[in-house]
Amino acid sequence: MSLKGSNGKYSASVVVPVSAQKAWGVLTNYESMAGVMPDIQQAKVVSRSGRLVELLQTYKAPYTFGLSINARLQVQETPPSRMRYQLISGERIKELQGIWSITPVRGGVLVRHQLQVVPQLPSFLLGTYYELIETNLRQSMQILAQQMLKG
């Protein structure tokens, strides 16, 4: 597992010995991630139109300082290799966008998550927030890899 970046701009990646289709199936099973990922309390697909998905997620984790934070995301899927998402609306989030990519490599796939997040927080909390979100990203990538292996 690799995590690069700081201050809300990150690239996390992990190699998983599964097919791209299997990895994609786990990654896009949005509602099943609630309670499995350390920060996703609830997840609901609000609408789907072709490759566009509208998703409502509730986050609760150390980086939310104990609060449940709701976010509505638009996801553009390009199966089985790429997913782009961006914030439509959210509580205490100024900006949230990212790209998931699945790239075949020898012995499996490289799963990469590029993320940009700007919370709506007092500036004195930002350092703590970024430390906590980095820990969460590491945990999330490891759990995602485990879910892909279980399939």
Put a short name on every predicted segment.
Residues 1-48, 139:
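Hydrophobic ligand-binding cavity/cleft-lining segments
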Residues 7-9, 50-52, 80-82, 106-110:
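A generic structural signal for beta-strand entry/edge sites
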Residues 9-11, 67-72, 94-99:
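Short, surface-exposed coil-to-beta transition loops
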Residues 12-14, 57, 85, 113-115:
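Preference for bulky hydrophobic residues occupying beta-strand positions
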Residues 16-20, 59-63, 77-79, 89-91, ...:
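Beta-strand elements of well-folded, non-transmembrane domains
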Residues 22-26, 33, 75, 111-113, ...:
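Hydrophobic pocket/interface hotspot
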Residues 44-91, 142-151:
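Glycine-rich portal/gate segments that line the openings of hydrophobic small-molecule binding cavities
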Residues 87-135, 139:
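Beta-strand/loop substructures that line and gate deep hydrophobic ligand-binding cavities in soluble
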